[in-house]
UniProtKB/Swiss-Prot annotation:
The modification N6-acetyllysine is found at residues 446, 453, 464. The modification N6-(pyridoxal phosphate)lysine is found at residue 276. GO terms for cellular component: cytosol; membrane. Pyridoxal 5'-phosphate binds at residues 126-127, 212, 275. NCBIfam families: Glu-decarb-GAD (TIGR01788). The lineage of its organism: Bacteria, Pseudomonadati, Pseudomonadota, Gammaproteobacteria, Enterobacterales. Changing residue 276 to H: Abolishes pyridoxal phosphate binding. Its EC number is 4.1.1.15. It comes from Escherichia coli (strain K12). It comes from the Bacteria. This is Glutamate decarboxylase beta. Changing Lys-276 to Ala increases thermal stability and protease resistance. The unfolding temperature is increased by 11 degrees Celsius. It is found in: Cytoplasm; Membrane.
Protein backbone atom coordinates (compact mmCIF):
# COMPACT_ATOMS: atom_id res chain seq x y z
CA UNK A 1 0.00 0.00 0.00
CA UNK A 2 1.58 3.28 -1.07
CA UNK A 3 1.51 6.52 0.92
CA UNK A 4 -1.47 7.97 -0.97
CA UNK A 5 -3.52 4.85 -0.34
CA UNK A 6 -2.65 4.98 3.35
CA UNK A 7 -3.66 8.65 3.49
CA UNK A 8 -6.93 7.94 1.72
CA UNK A 9 -7.66 5.02 4.06
CA UNK A 10 -6.90 7.12 7.14
CA UNK A 11 -9.21 9.80 5.79
CA UNK A 12 -11.94 7.27 5.19
CA UNK A 13 -11.66 5.70 8.63
CA UNK A 14 -10.56 8.49 10.96
CA UNK A 15 -11.42 11.92 9.58
CA UNK A 16 -14.47 13.62 11.00
CA UNK A 17 -17.14 14.38 8.44
CA UNK A 18 -16.08 18.04 8.38
CA UNK A 19 -12.48 17.04 7.77
CA UNK A 20 -13.30 14.56 5.04
CA UNK A 21 -12.04 15.25 1.54
CA UNK A 22 -15.44 14.83 -0.10
CA UNK A 23 -17.07 17.56 1.97
CA UNK A 24 -14.60 20.13 0.65
CA UNK A 25 -16.24 20.07 -2.79
CA UNK A 26 -19.56 21.49 -3.98
CA UNK A 27 -22.23 18.82 -4.25
CA UNK A 28 -23.05 17.73 -7.79
CA UNK A 29 -26.30 19.18 -9.14
CA UNK A 30 -26.26 18.74 -12.92
CA UNK A 31 -24.42 15.49 -13.61
CA UNK A 32 -24.57 12.06 -12.05
CA UNK A 33 -21.72 11.82 -9.48
CA UNK A 34 -18.66 9.83 -10.55
CA UNK A 35 -17.40 8.79 -7.13
CA UNK A 36 -18.90 7.53 -3.91
CA UNK A 37 -18.55 9.26 -0.54
CA UNK A 38 -19.04 8.35 3.08
CA UNK A 39 -22.67 8.06 4.13
CA UNK A 40 -22.30 10.49 7.03
CA UNK A 41 -20.80 13.11 4.70
CA UNK A 42 -23.58 12.71 2.13
CA UNK A 43 -26.14 13.00 4.91
CA UNK A 44 -24.49 16.11 6.33
CA UNK A 45 -24.47 17.87 2.95
CA UNK A 46 -28.15 17.22 2.35
CA UNK A 47 -29.14 17.90 5.95
CA UNK A 48 -27.43 21.30 5.83
CA UNK A 49 -29.15 22.22 2.56
CA UNK A 50 -32.54 21.46 4.09
CA UNK A 51 -31.98 24.14 6.73
CA UNK A 52 -32.70 26.63 3.93
CA UNK A 53 -36.30 25.41 3.71
CA UNK A 54 -38.85 27.36 5.68
CA UNK A 55 -39.84 26.11 9.12
CA UNK A 56 -42.87 23.92 8.44
CA UNK A 57 -44.42 24.67 11.84
CA UNK A 58 -44.45 28.39 10.97
CA UNK A 59 -45.99 27.74 7.57
CA UNK A 60 -49.46 29.21 8.00
CA UNK A 61 -50.15 29.00 4.26
CA UNK A 62 -50.40 25.23 4.05
CA UNK A 63 -53.49 23.18 4.80
CA UNK A 64 -51.31 20.12 5.36
CA UNK A 65 -50.23 18.65 8.67
CA UNK A 66 -46.82 19.74 9.92
CA UNK A 67 -46.80 17.86 13.23
CA UNK A 68 -46.78 14.11 13.81
CA UNK A 69 -46.13 12.20 17.00
CA UNK A 70 -43.27 9.73 17.47
CA UNK A 71 -45.45 6.69 16.87
CA UNK A 72 -46.35 7.95 13.40
CA UNK A 73 -42.65 8.21 12.56
CA UNK A 74 -42.11 4.65 13.83
CA UNK A 75 -45.02 3.25 11.82
CA UNK A 76 -43.90 5.09 8.70
CA UNK A 77 -40.43 3.60 9.15
CA UNK A 78 -41.87 0.09 9.58
CA UNK A 79 -43.87 0.49 6.38
CA UNK A 80 -41.34 2.26 4.16
CA UNK A 81 -40.61 -0.89 2.13
CA UNK A 82 -44.20 -2.13 1.87
CA UNK A 83 -45.76 -1.37 -1.49
CA UNK A 84 -49.36 -0.22 -1.03
CA UNK A 85 -50.47 -1.60 -4.39
CA UNK A 86 -49.25 -5.16 -3.67
CA UNK A 87 -52.28 -6.49 -1.81
CA UNK A 88 -51.30 -10.16 -2.04
CA UNK A 89 -47.79 -9.60 -0.68
CA UNK A 90 -48.90 -7.30 2.17
CA UNK A 91 -52.36 -8.55 3.11
CA UNK A 92 -52.50 -6.97 6.56
CA UNK A 93 -51.65 -3.54 5.20
CA UNK A 94 -54.40 -4.08 2.62
CA UNK A 95 -56.81 -5.07 5.38
CA UNK A 96 -55.98 -1.90 7.31
CA UNK A 97 -56.61 0.11 4.14
CA UNK A 98 -60.09 -1.43 3.82
CA UNK A 99 -60.80 -0.70 7.48
CA UNK A 100 -59.99 2.95 6.90
CA UNK A 101 -62.34 3.06 3.89
CA UNK A 102 -65.14 1.70 6.09
CA UNK A 103 -64.39 4.20 8.84
CA UNK A 104 -64.39 7.19 6.50
CA UNK A 105 -67.59 5.99 4.81
CA UNK A 106 -69.22 5.70 8.23
CA UNK A 107 -68.04 9.19 9.14
CA UNK A 108 -69.68 10.59 6.00
CA UNK A 109 -72.98 8.70 6.43
CA UNK A 110 -72.61 6.40 3.43
CA UNK A 111 -75.42 3.83 3.21
CA UNK A 112 -74.58 0.48 4.79
CA UNK A 113 -72.79 -1.59 2.12
CA UNK A 114 -74.50 -4.77 0.95
CA UNK A 115 -71.38 -6.92 1.35
CA UNK A 116 -70.01 -5.21 4.46
CA UNK A 117 -67.27 -3.33 2.61
CA UNK A 118 -67.71 0.34 1.72
CA UNK A 119 -66.76 1.54 -1.76
CA UNK A 120 -63.70 3.77 -1.82
CA UNK A 121 -59.95 3.94 -1.96
CA UNK A 122 -56.92 5.57 -0.47
CA UNK A 123 -55.06 7.99 -2.73
CA UNK A 124 -51.83 9.97 -2.68
CA UNK A 125 -53.87 13.04 -1.75
CA UNK A 126 -57.18 14.77 -2.36
CA UNK A 127 -56.14 15.80 -5.89
CA UNK A 128 -55.95 12.18 -7.03
CA UNK A 129 -59.19 11.55 -5.14
CA UNK A 130 -60.85 14.38 -7.09
CA UNK A 131 -59.58 12.93 -10.36
CA UNK A 132 -61.12 9.56 -9.52
CA UNK A 133 -64.40 11.09 -8.44
CA UNK A 134 -64.50 13.14 -11.64
CA UNK A 135 -63.78 10.10 -13.81
CA UNK A 136 -66.63 8.17 -12.23
CA UNK A 137 -68.95 11.16 -12.80
CA UNK A 138 -68.04 11.32 -16.47
CA UNK A 139 -68.49 7.58 -16.97
CA UNK A 140 -71.92 7.58 -15.25
CA UNK A 141 -73.07 10.55 -17.34
CA UNK A 142 -71.83 8.94 -20.55
CA UNK A 143 -73.74 5.75 -19.80
CA UNK A 144 -76.96 7.70 -19.24
CA UNK A 145 -76.52 9.71 -22.44
CA UNK A 146 -75.71 6.62 -24.53
CA UNK A 147 -78.76 4.84 -23.12
CA UNK A 148 -80.86 7.81 -24.21
CA UNK A 149 -79.26 7.85 -27.67
CA UNK A 150 -77.74 11.29 -27.13
CA UNK A 151 -74.24 12.57 -28.04
CA UNK A 152 -71.49 12.38 -25.43
CA UNK A 153 -68.88 14.63 -27.00
CA UNK A 154 -69.47 17.81 -24.95
CA UNK A 155 -69.38 17.00 -21.23
CA UNK A 156 -69.14 19.86 -18.76
CA UNK A 157 -68.55 20.18 -15.03
CA UNK A 158 -70.06 22.97 -12.90
CA UNK A 159 -68.23 24.27 -9.84
CA UNK A 160 -67.35 27.36 -7.85
CA UNK A 161 -63.79 28.58 -7.19
CA UNK A 162 -61.98 25.26 -7.11
CA UNK A 163 -58.52 23.95 -6.41
CA UNK A 164 -56.26 23.63 -9.46
CA UNK A 165 -56.71 19.84 -9.60
CA UNK A 166 -60.17 20.33 -11.11
CA UNK A 167 -58.68 22.40 -13.92
CA UNK A 168 -56.27 19.54 -14.52
CA UNK A 169 -59.10 17.02 -14.48
CA UNK A 170 -61.06 19.03 -17.05
CA UNK A 171 -58.06 19.32 -19.36
CA UNK A 172 -56.84 15.73 -19.01
CA UNK A 173 -60.28 14.15 -19.45
CA UNK A 174 -61.61 16.60 -22.05
CA UNK A 175 -64.38 18.13 -19.94
CA UNK A 176 -65.52 21.76 -20.17
CA UNK A 177 -65.06 23.39 -16.77
CA UNK A 178 -67.86 25.83 -16.01
CA UNK A 179 -66.39 27.55 -13.00
CA UNK A 180 -68.74 30.06 -11.38
CA UNK A 181 -66.43 33.07 -11.00
CA UNK A 182 -65.73 34.89 -7.77
CA UNK A 183 -67.03 38.44 -7.83
CA UNK A 184 -67.31 41.15 -5.17
CA UNK A 185 -70.15 40.20 -2.87
CA UNK A 186 -70.44 36.73 -4.44
CA UNK A 187 -67.28 34.82 -3.66
CA UNK A 188 -68.80 31.34 -3.83
CA UNK A 189 -71.08 29.24 -6.02
CA UNK A 190 -74.74 30.09 -5.40
CA UNK A 191 -77.83 28.14 -6.52
CA UNK A 192 -78.94 30.69 -9.12
CA UNK A 193 -75.66 30.94 -11.00
CA UNK A 194 -75.12 27.18 -10.66
CA UNK A 195 -78.45 26.36 -12.31
CA UNK A 196 -77.74 28.84 -15.11
CA UNK A 197 -74.57 26.87 -15.91
CA UNK A 198 -76.21 23.41 -15.91
CA UNK A 199 -77.62 21.49 -18.86
CA UNK A 200 -78.00 17.89 -19.99
CA UNK A 201 -74.26 17.69 -20.71
CA UNK A 202 -73.36 18.49 -17.10
CA UNK A 203 -71.63 15.43 -15.66
CA UNK A 204 -71.91 16.80 -12.13
CA UNK A 205 -71.72 19.74 -9.75
CA UNK A 206 -68.76 20.07 -7.37
CA UNK A 207 -69.15 22.21 -4.26
CA UNK A 208 -65.94 22.84 -2.34
CA UNK A 209 -66.44 22.15 1.35
CA UNK A 210 -63.62 24.45 2.43
CA UNK A 211 -62.73 26.88 -0.38
CA UNK A 212 -58.97 27.14 -0.75
CA UNK A 213 -58.92 30.91 -1.24
CA UNK A 214 -60.71 31.86 1.97
CA UNK A 215 -61.53 28.77 4.04
CA UNK A 216 -65.33 29.20 3.84
CA UNK A 217 -67.66 26.30 3.13
CA UNK A 218 -69.70 26.16 -0.05
CA UNK A 219 -72.73 24.62 1.60
CA UNK A 220 -73.97 21.69 -0.53
CA UNK A 221 -77.57 21.51 0.70
CA UNK A 222 -78.91 24.69 -0.98
CA UNK A 223 -77.21 23.61 -4.22
CA UNK A 224 -78.66 20.11 -3.84
CA UNK A 225 -82.17 21.49 -3.34
CA UNK A 226 -81.80 23.72 -6.40
CA UNK A 227 -80.82 20.68 -8.47
CA UNK A 228 -83.95 18.89 -7.23
CA UNK A 229 -86.08 21.75 -8.55
CA UNK A 230 -84.06 21.83 -11.78
CA UNK A 231 -84.82 18.14 -12.33
CA UNK A 232 -88.50 18.69 -11.58
CA UNK A 233 -88.60 21.49 -14.16
CA UNK A 234 -86.43 19.95 -16.89
CA UNK A 235 -86.14 16.23 -16.22
CA UNK A 236 -82.33 16.53 -16.09
CA UNK A 237 -80.81 14.55 -13.21
CA UNK A 238 -77.39 15.86 -12.11
CA UNK A 239 -75.06 14.19 -9.59
CA UNK A 240 -72.86 15.90 -7.02
CA UNK A 241 -69.29 15.24 -5.94
CA UNK A 242 -68.22 16.99 -2.74
CA UNK A 243 -64.62 18.21 -2.69
CA UNK A 244 -64.16 18.06 1.07
CA UNK A 245 -60.37 18.22 1.01
CA UNK A 246 -60.38 20.10 4.32
CA UNK A 247 -63.94 20.08 5.62
CA UNK A 248 -64.41 16.33 5.35
CA UNK A 249 -62.48 15.71 8.55
CA UNK A 250 -63.76 18.81 10.36
CA UNK A 251 -67.54 19.12 10.11
CA UNK A 252 -68.29 15.55 11.28
CA UNK A 253 -66.64 16.39 14.60
CA UNK A 254 -67.29 20.09 15.24
CA UNK A 255 -70.37 20.88 13.12
CA UNK A 256 -72.27 17.59 12.77
CA UNK A 257 -75.58 19.35 12.05
CA UNK A 258 -74.34 20.66 8.69
CA UNK A 259 -75.86 18.36 6.07
CA UNK A 260 -73.19 18.12 3.41
CA UNK A 261 -72.38 14.43 2.84
CA UNK A 262 -74.15 11.23 1.75
CA UNK A 263 -77.23 12.34 3.67
CA UNK A 264 -77.91 14.27 0.46
CA UNK A 265 -79.15 11.75 -2.17
CA UNK A 266 -77.46 13.46 -5.13
CA UNK A 267 -74.04 13.13 -3.53
CA UNK A 268 -72.47 10.15 -5.28
CA UNK A 269 -68.86 10.63 -4.12
CA UNK A 270 -66.77 12.60 -1.64
CA UNK A 271 -63.03 13.27 -1.62
CA UNK A 272 -60.85 14.51 1.21
CA UNK A 273 -57.24 14.85 2.28
CA UNK A 274 -56.09 12.55 5.03
CA UNK A 275 -52.96 14.66 5.34
CA UNK A 276 -54.87 17.86 6.02
CA UNK A 277 -57.40 17.74 8.83
CA UNK A 278 -57.42 13.95 8.72
CA UNK A 279 -54.15 14.43 10.66
CA UNK A 280 -52.19 11.85 8.63
CA UNK A 281 -48.68 12.55 7.30
CA UNK A 282 -48.25 13.86 3.77
CA UNK A 283 -49.31 11.55 0.98
CA UNK A 284 -52.77 10.41 2.12
CA UNK A 285 -56.17 11.09 0.57
CA UNK A 286 -59.55 9.37 0.41
CA UNK A 287 -62.43 9.09 -2.03
CA UNK A 288 -65.66 7.32 -1.08
CA UNK A 289 -68.61 6.46 -3.32
CA UNK A 290 -72.19 6.20 -2.10
CA UNK A 291 -72.48 2.56 -3.22
CA UNK A 292 -71.30 0.12 -5.87
CA UNK A 293 -73.67 1.61 -8.44
CA UNK A 294 -71.93 4.99 -8.14
CA UNK A 295 -68.57 3.55 -9.26
CA UNK A 296 -68.71 2.22 -12.85
CA UNK A 297 -67.20 -1.25 -12.83
CA UNK A 298 -65.27 -0.70 -16.06
CA UNK A 299 -63.03 1.68 -14.08
CA UNK A 300 -62.17 -0.99 -11.50
CA UNK A 301 -59.22 -3.37 -11.88
CA UNK A 302 -58.98 -6.61 -9.92
CA UNK A 303 -55.81 -7.78 -8.17
CA UNK A 304 -55.04 -10.94 -6.19
CA UNK A 305 -55.80 -10.79 -2.48
CA UNK A 306 -55.94 -13.67 0.05
CA UNK A 307 -56.57 -16.31 -2.58
CA UNK A 308 -59.26 -14.24 -4.23
CA UNK A 309 -59.46 -10.87 -5.90
CA UNK A 310 -60.09 -7.33 -4.78
CA UNK A 311 -61.01 -4.33 -6.90
CA UNK A 312 -58.67 -1.34 -7.12
CA UNK A 313 -59.25 2.07 -8.65
CA UNK A 314 -56.30 4.44 -8.56
CA UNK A 315 -54.09 6.53 -10.81
CA UNK A 316 -50.91 6.05 -8.80
CA UNK A 317 -49.41 2.63 -8.27
CA UNK A 318 -46.25 1.92 -6.27
CA UNK A 319 -45.93 3.89 -3.03
CA UNK A 320 -45.25 3.09 0.63
CA UNK A 321 -48.12 1.82 2.75
CA UNK A 322 -46.98 3.99 5.64
CA UNK A 323 -49.42 6.83 5.06
CA UNK A 324 -52.41 4.47 5.27
CA UNK A 325 -50.98 2.78 8.37
CA UNK A 326 -50.41 6.16 10.00
CA UNK A 327 -53.95 7.25 9.14
CA UNK A 328 -55.31 4.11 10.80
CA UNK A 329 -53.19 4.89 13.86
CA UNK A 330 -54.76 8.35 14.11
CA UNK A 331 -58.26 6.89 13.75
CA UNK A 332 -57.60 4.34 16.51
CA UNK A 333 -55.64 6.69 18.74
CA UNK A 334 -58.12 9.58 18.66
CA UNK A 335 -61.53 8.26 17.69
CA UNK A 336 -64.43 10.68 17.42
CA UNK A 337 -63.71 12.02 20.88
CA UNK A 338 -60.07 12.82 20.19
CA UNK A 339 -60.67 14.29 16.74
CA UNK A 340 -63.34 16.56 18.21
CA UNK A 341 -60.91 17.86 20.83
CA UNK A 342 -58.06 18.39 18.37
CA UNK A 343 -60.21 20.17 15.78
CA UNK A 344 -61.96 22.32 18.39
CA UNK A 345 -58.56 23.47 19.62
CA UNK A 346 -57.71 24.71 16.12
CA UNK A 347 -61.00 26.60 15.91
CA UNK A 348 -60.35 28.22 19.28
CA UNK A 349 -56.99 29.49 18.04
CA UNK A 350 -58.59 30.81 14.83
CA UNK A 351 -61.29 32.66 16.79
CA UNK A 352 -58.68 34.19 19.08
CA UNK A 353 -56.57 35.38 16.15
CA UNK A 354 -59.59 36.85 14.36
CA UNK A 355 -60.62 38.78 17.48
CA UNK A 356 -57.12 40.13 18.13
CA UNK A 357 -56.26 40.98 14.51
CA UNK A 358 -59.54 42.88 14.17
CA UNK A 359 -58.20 45.34 16.76
CA UNK A 360 -55.03 46.03 14.78
CA UNK A 361 -56.25 47.51 11.51
CA UNK A 362 -59.12 48.44 9.19
CA UNK A 363 -59.88 44.85 8.22
CA UNK A 364 -62.96 43.20 6.75
CA UNK A 365 -63.11 39.51 7.58
CA UNK A 366 -64.22 36.96 5.01
CA UNK A 367 -63.66 33.95 7.26
CA UNK A 368 -63.28 34.11 11.05
CA UNK A 369 -62.70 30.41 11.60
CA UNK A 370 -66.09 29.52 13.07
CA UNK A 371 -67.10 25.82 12.79
CA UNK A 372 -70.44 26.73 11.21
CA UNK A 373 -68.71 28.97 8.65
CA UNK A 374 -65.78 26.98 7.35
CA UNK A 375 -62.44 25.50 8.28
CA UNK A 376 -60.22 26.97 11.06
CA UNK A 377 -58.83 29.72 8.85
CA UNK A 378 -58.72 33.48 9.29
CA UNK A 379 -59.08 35.40 6.02
CA UNK A 380 -59.41 39.17 5.73
CA UNK A 381 -58.92 42.16 3.44
CA UNK A 382 -58.42 45.86 3.94
CA UNK A 383 -61.76 47.65 4.15
CA UNK A 384 -62.77 49.45 0.98
CA UNK A 385 -61.61 53.05 0.98
CA UNK A 386 -59.16 52.52 3.84
CA UNK A 387 -55.43 53.16 3.44
CA UNK A 388 -53.49 52.18 6.55
CA UNK A 389 -50.21 53.10 4.85
CA UNK A 390 -49.21 49.54 4.02
CA UNK A 391 -50.43 46.68 1.87
CA UNK A 392 -51.06 43.13 2.94
CA UNK A 393 -48.10 42.19 0.75
CA UNK A 394 -45.90 44.46 2.90
CA UNK A 395 -47.21 42.79 6.04
CA UNK A 396 -46.66 39.30 4.63
CA UNK A 397 -43.08 40.20 3.72
CA UNK A 398 -42.32 41.55 7.21
CA UNK A 399 -43.76 38.45 8.88
CA UNK A 400 -41.63 36.24 6.67
CA UNK A 401 -38.50 37.88 8.06
CA UNK A 402 -39.49 36.34 11.40
CA UNK A 403 -40.04 32.94 9.78
CA UNK A 404 -43.83 33.16 9.48
CA UNK A 405 -45.21 32.15 6.10
CA UNK A 406 -48.52 34.04 5.96
CA UNK A 407 -49.78 34.41 2.39
CA UNK A 408 -51.24 37.54 0.85
CA UNK A 409 -52.77 37.02 -2.59
CA UNK A 410 -55.50 38.17 -4.95
CA UNK A 411 -58.78 36.34 -5.30
CA UNK A 412 -59.77 34.77 -8.60
CA UNK A 413 -62.45 35.18 -11.24
CA UNK A 414 -63.87 38.70 -11.33
CA UNK A 415 -62.42 39.56 -7.92
CA UNK A 416 -58.75 39.82 -8.83
CA UNK A 417 -58.55 43.35 -7.45
CA UNK A 418 -59.27 42.03 -3.94
CA UNK A 419 -56.14 41.20 -1.94
CA UNK A 420 -56.59 38.98 1.10
CA UNK A 421 -54.41 37.53 3.82
CA UNK A 422 -55.12 34.03 5.09
CA UNK A 423 -53.90 32.26 8.23
CA UNK A 424 -54.40 28.50 8.55
CA UNK A 425 -54.80 27.09 12.06
CA UNK A 426 -54.21 23.37 12.54
CA UNK A 427 -52.84 20.82 14.99
CA UNK A 428 -49.51 21.97 16.38
CA UNK A 429 -50.34 25.68 16.08
CA UNK A 430 -51.46 26.09 19.66
CA UNK A 431 -52.55 29.22 21.55
CA UNK A 432 -49.10 30.09 22.87
CA UNK A 433 -47.63 29.82 19.37
CA UNK A 434 -50.45 32.01 18.04
CA UNK A 435 -49.61 34.64 20.65
CA UNK A 436 -46.03 34.72 19.33
CA UNK A 437 -47.43 35.31 15.84
CA UNK A 438 -49.48 38.22 17.15
CA UNK A 439 -46.41 39.76 18.78
CA UNK A 440 -44.55 39.60 15.47
CA UNK A 441 -47.65 40.90 13.67
CA UNK A 442 -47.74 43.96 15.93
CA UNK A 443 -43.98 44.47 15.57
CA UNK A 444 -44.35 44.30 11.78
CA UNK A 445 -47.06 46.96 11.83
CA UNK A 446 -44.88 49.20 13.99
CA UNK A 447 -41.93 48.76 11.65
CA UNK A 448 -44.05 49.68 8.64
CA UNK A 449 -45.37 52.72 10.50
CA UNK A 450 -41.84 53.80 11.47
CA UNK A 451 -40.52 53.35 7.91
CA UNK A 452 -43.17 54.84 5.62
CA UNK A 453 -40.84 54.87 2.61
CA UNK A 454 -40.88 51.07 2.63
CA UNK A 455 -44.66 50.84 2.55
CA UNK A 456 -46.35 49.57 -0.58
CA UNK A 457 -43.17 48.36 -2.28
CA UNK A 458 -43.62 44.64 -1.68
CA UNK A 459 -44.75 42.81 -4.78
CA UNK A 460 -47.27 39.99 -4.96
CA UNK A 461 -45.34 37.03 -3.63
CA UNK A 462 -45.21 33.46 -4.84
CA UNK A 463 -47.34 31.85 -2.14
CA UNK A 464 -49.64 29.15 -3.45
CA UNK A 465 -52.95 29.67 -1.72
CA UNK A 466 -54.10 26.18 -2.61
Amino acid sequence: MDKKQVTDLRSELLDSRFGAKSISTIAESKRFPLHEMRDDVAFQIINDELYLDGNARQNLATFCQTWDDENVHKLMDLSINKNWIDKEEYPQSAAIDLRCVNMVADLWHAPAPKNGQAVGTNTIGSSEACMLGGMAMKWRWRKRMEAAGKPTDKPNLVCGPVQICWHKFARYWDVELREIPMRPGQLFMDPKRMIEACDENTIGVVPTFGVTYTGNYEFPQPLHDALDKFQADTGIDIDMHIDAASGGFLAPFVAPDIVWDFRLPRVKSISASGHKFGLAPLGCGWVIWRDEEALPQELVFNVDYLGGQIGTFAINFSRPAGQVIAQYYEFLRLGREGYTKVQNASYQVAAYLADEIAKLGPYEFICTGRPDEGIPAVCFKLKDGEDPGYTLYDLSERLRLRGWQVPAFTLGGEATDIVVMRIMCRRGFEMDFAELLLEDYKASLKYLSDHPKLQGIAQQNSFKHT
